[in-house]
Amino acid sequence: MDILFYKVFRNLYIKNIIFKILRLYKNYSKKYNVFKNVEQYKLFKDKEYLVKMEWDMNIEIPINLIPDNTIKYLKFGKYFNQPIKSLPIGVELIDLKYSLNFNQNQFQIPITLKTLILNRDFNQNFTKLSNNNNDDDNNNLSLNKVENISFGRDYDCLIDETIFSKSITSIKLSDSFCQELDDRTLPKTLTFLEFGWTFNGYLKIGDLDGLSKLRVLKFGVSFNTEIQCNVLPNSIEKITFGSSFNQVILPNSLPRNLRILKFGSSFNQPIFPPPSSLSSESLPNLLKLKFDSSFNQPILPSSLSNSITRLEFRSTHFNQQLSISSLPKNLKYLGIFINNYSTIIEDNDNNNNSEFLKIINILN
């Protein structure tokens, strides 16, 4: 096998063809190629190498125009307002974000589809979609291969876990979504959940029950509601709070398996010693912690989990003194701004300056 490979690869003609094909695939994978009329696509000479394509016209895609197993990422332009019924097999992502309309009754998904991005104006009760393989059994299944779905800007309708397939792992809710959640709202297979801009709902015990596979949780800009104990699944490893969040972190309100925690620009709450929710007792697995632009609170000994290896203070006016004794024992990276440098480390008898200086990094 190796001998055959070297014989083929040493043939300059074949070698040049291989590299040409690789270059074409690489070039057409970087950005979307925009087509504004059907004739432009027909005349395009490298169709078989296209990976990303934007259909920027208000014309239904003709049947069999696009060969199967070529396009993987298909985006529809802002003028598109037609039924979607003849998409090729092989499409893994459909982006309708900027299209004029989405009629779920005139949309058949390719059986290979993994990611669906809905358009901004879509705000109808989301029902079951069918695929385009004309199989009656499969036509009764909703999004039977889709793993990721992103709702458009205006979507604010009730959702139910039964509309999603068993393969769904990621949901991004719309900026307008403000519906109450319960244990039947979201599919149990989720590993990623992102709330939109306006969501500020009170999460109750049981609302997220069953999401035992959830790993990443992102809150939107407006979220500023206190997190109660036993509400968030312990499976969560990363939480990002939006810019409005400024609530006291109650003991045991954050998942014990949390590894990454990022606060937004408004957060400026005291960080208490144990049983504080940021201490080793509550978050024994926390590795990365980031405070943002408003934070300016003292860091007391044992108030932060000793498991933390990376700690950032991204506030230009953070001026609390820090010492080795107040920082996590496993800390390898401490990020601060240059204008706070002298204030933070000056004249502290508890500081072992040689150790302290090794971990300090100046943020841009």
From Swiss-Prot:
Keywords, comma-separated and alphabetical: Repeat
S-S bonds: none
The keyword Ribosomal protein is annotated on this UniProt entry: no
UniProt xrefs under InterPro entries: FNIP, STK_FNIP-Repeat
Family matches, as Pfam families: FNIP
Record PANTHER family: FNIP REPEAT-CONTAINING PROTEIN, FNIP REPEAT-CONTAINING PROTEIN-RELATED
Protein name: FNIP repeat-containing protein DDB_G0277323
Species assigned in the record: Dictyostelium discoideum
Lineage: Eukaryota, Amoebozoa, Evosea, Eumycetozoa, Dictyostelia
